[in-house]
């Protein structure tokens, strides 16, 4: 069960730090785990639009919040902005559909993952990431079964990933203390 949280944290950190500007950069064996909405976001992005994403990602520290980042995106490309808003609304609707305990848990994960984002020019601190994942796992394990089931039902692709044996092996080795 705790692997679900590892994945959510890792996906958040990865998305916050390295936008895979092309679906072709993702190994085939992992593409099946990517939600259709994310695939649709990246579908048919031109080199120019990918460059815009890279540029804005490199300036992440200058944005006070998501709305500021979206506004900067809108100033660069209305098409890319529309795609980003659509994806954001999809994720937000899923989170908003959760009952209070599950929603609070997801909001806490998002806040923790965002706090891990390195300052400009700095590298991601892997030990902090591992500790954050351990903390999230502990909080997840403390949730009641109803909340855990709601999270699984709301985020089925996450469940699909965490039940994958290969992913479990990778996650377990990642969290080993050095």
Curated annotation (Swiss-Prot):
Coiled coil region boundaries: 67-89, 122-154
GO cellular component: extracellular region
Compartment(s): Secreted
Signal peptide per UniProt: 1-16
Keyword Signal belongs to the record: yes
Top-level lineage group: Eukaryota
InterPro entries in the record: Gp-FAR-1
Gene3D superfamilies: 1.20.120.1100
PTM summary: Not glycosylated.
Keywords: Coiled coil, Lipid-binding, Retinol-binding, Secreted, Signal, Vitamin A
GO molecular function: fatty acid binding; retinal binding; retinol binding
Pfam families tied to this protein: Gp-FAR-1 (PF05823)
Protein task: Binds retinol and different fatty acids.
Recorded family membership: Belongs to the fatty-acid and retinol-binding protein (FARBP) family.
This protein's name: Fatty-acid and retinol-binding protein 1
Organism: Litomosoides sigmodontis (Filarial nematode worm)
Lineage of the organism: Eukaryota, Metazoa, Ecdysozoa, Nematoda, Chromadorea
